Amino acid sequence: MSPTDSPDSPDRSASSDDRDDLDRPVLERSQSWRDLHVLLANALRHPDEQFSDAIETGEFEAQLRSLVSTLDVDLAISLSPPLEESSGLTAAYIDLFEGRRQPYAPPAESPYRAWYDRDEGGLMNGPAAAEMRQRYRAIDATVPDAYAADHVALLLEYESLLLEAGDHDAYRSFARSHFEWLPALRRATDAAAAEAPVYRWLVVLLDELFVVLRDRLELSEPTTADVERMLGRIGPDG
């Protein structure tokens, strides 16, 4: 099965021609957008030797610059990762994203979202994670044990599969419904105790790229009130 057979398919009432016109800035360079999603997904996984080497040698920056140039994306943030010892990436990841230092920034969607019939949040494995497990089952995929089903790296990877499958309706719907929390992740990262310069930079980069992507897909930005509610759900300590 393809990702487009997953649950919660987008409303297809709009004509195909209308949707293609709306998504054309992404449609025309879908392979490059897919590659950018994969690049960022790999960067936001637990750091491994390949990622550490790519940061240290400049390979990651070179790939990022090439894709951003191809996609004609203009960002205020530098495309050069901050200097950080590659040996410290694992500690930085755990400090910033997994709560070894408080406050921290949960890198999964559920904590920022309302918990089923209540507005409270702050917990892992909420409705977003349950939906993602359904989506993975629909494509005969499994969630890696080390990650929440709605971890940002897995969401990016799933988005890349939608682009690869060529279903831009599903891609647009998924971008709208599963990445609205990125501004809250950025705010939580700003307030986190960990230094983690590379991962702080990656979170800002991701958030700014999705501002561009929403604009090209004509999706609305999350409101300030929405972001504040999301931050309130994770609490002062992440």
Describe the predicted segments one by one.
Residues 2-238:
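Charged, alpha-helix-forming regions
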